[in-house]
Amino acid sequence: AGDLGLLLLRVFTGALLIHHGYEKLANIENFADAFVRPLHLPFPILLSYVAAFSEVIGSWLLITGLLTRMGALAVAGTISVAIYHAIVTAGFNIYLLELLGLYFAAAVAVLACGPGVFSIDELIARRLEPDMQFSAAEDTDFAAGEAAVLEEAVASR
């Protein structure tokens, strides 16, 4: 059930976010003028392209489950700058921050949990390590299992 939840989170987040990146690429000058220059950041056109490609490529990586954590990191980074922009220009306006907060939380959740078993990352991990006793997407479960073994060993003393 958890892996299905991660799949849905990845696919819906990527599918809903990707158009924002394509819209930036369609008119990069307007995006730079409206969002990057007000923050007084250097190289506004370059940073606008970085934001757009982070959203487009990061979204595709989330959707496919390939290099998923890198995609989630790109999305979280770009969205954190968008949150900063929203706060600087409009204060703590919940109507601006709620969608950004959801995108950020989804990216951080995928970053923390990994892609799940329904991902290209998992297929690659299984192909590279055919004798693996546990899923690469379930490394936290493996760590929990190690902790249980240690607790059992201590209790048996």
Predicted regions and their residues:
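Extended, low-polarity transmembrane helix blocks
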Residues: 1-26, 45-53, 57, 64-157
